[in-house]
Amino acid sequence: MTLPDRLGGWKVKRFNKLGGNLAGPSGAVKSDGHLTRFNRHRKTATEERGQVAVGMKAVAVKAGVSLATVSNVLNHPDIVAPSTRRRVQRAIDALGFVRNESARQLRAGRSRFIGLLMLDIGNPFFTDVALGAEQAAEEAGYAVVLCDSRQDLEREGRYLALLEEQRVEGILLSPVAVSGTRLDQIRRRGTPVVLVDRRSRSRGECFVAVDDVLGGDIAVSHLLDGGHQRLAFVGGSFDIRQVQDRYEGAVAALVRAGRRQDELAVITTALLTLECGQRAGRQIADLPRTRRPTAAFCANDLLALGLLQEMTRRGVRVPQDLAIVGYDDIAFAAGAAVPLSSVRQPRAELGRTAAQLLLEEARAPEQHRHRRVVFKPELVVRASSARAVTGHRKNAAS
């Protein structure tokens, strides 16, 4: 035997010259040539972790207090003397007690979780929104259950049903499409819903959003100020309200400048992703130079970055041949090969404000008044549209 069967507790899988396995004492092994450590005692997972759950009664006995005192330490620690809290906590730590949240939730009819259902958590914009919401929830003693609809209406519906079944304290929703009837039904059954990054005409709900019509307007106004004659809007699907609003703002800027709506070429994408931006870039690059737009406003930064990548690959210079403006001002925008001009949204503040409104309604519905919070966007000008305007920010409020 040229190799020991064991090296420091590791079983060595040995192979013959034909690539077959040499089975060790433990039986057959795979022929992938890696080392596998074996548990000599061969306990099951259940045996390793044990099966006996410690209850509150055991904690009370060990701490020398009543069951009610343990309950107060867990649920209302502010009314328990610090010395008693410490004694109960020592008993909890010694026994390894973990309270049954499901049972507590069943008794109370409420939970310490809020649902957060986003359009696309792979988009850094929604990641930042989620971070803001999570921070506000944590400060209030809640945790966040994060769900991703992937811009799919049926998937969104399944998650809404699941979150309601789990009796979350409330739902933060960035919807694919607003269904007033469905959301009204959820609210009537006792689960508050706050819309995030989406405006609503209903006065019976809270929402937190950005003025996307204004955002589209300032983006295209910026490009028109630079003398661009052939403009394109890149975005989709138009089922998503944010895309509609940003396009509407772009058209408003064009018409105000004395141009026709049909002078804004529309390149529709299936999704708001980097890959869709690259495909849009191929469409633009394949056009004859005399018909190719000289500026593009993209419905979000991922589309804009994908477009920028494809332009670079095809030898179309940005901004000399094509100026590009995105939307969201995600962290990657400033660090792109050609730093990307973008309409900035207060991403984390959107999430934080929405979570605060949701928890306010959930904890004191009889005092809550629905509010609409609309932030103003801001155009951040960088090199990708520098031919138009350079060296400053054009604030939407001006």
Question: Residue ranges of each PLM-predicted region?
Answer:
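Amphipathic helical "hinge" segments at domain boundaries
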Residues: 82, 97-170, 248-251
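Periplasmic-binding protein-like
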Residues: 167-175, 232-235, 267, 289-300, ...
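N-terminal helix-turn-helix DNA-binding module of bacterial transcription factors
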Residues: 7-113, 392-398
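Short acidic capping loops at alpha-helix termini that bridge into adjacent secondary structure
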Residues: 229-231, 261-265, 317-324
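Short beta-strand segments enriched in small/hydrophobic residues
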Residues: 67-72, 106-122, 222, 230-237
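Hinge/beta->alpha junction and helix N-cap segments in small-molecule ligand-binding domains
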Residues: 101, 118-128, 146-155, 181, ...
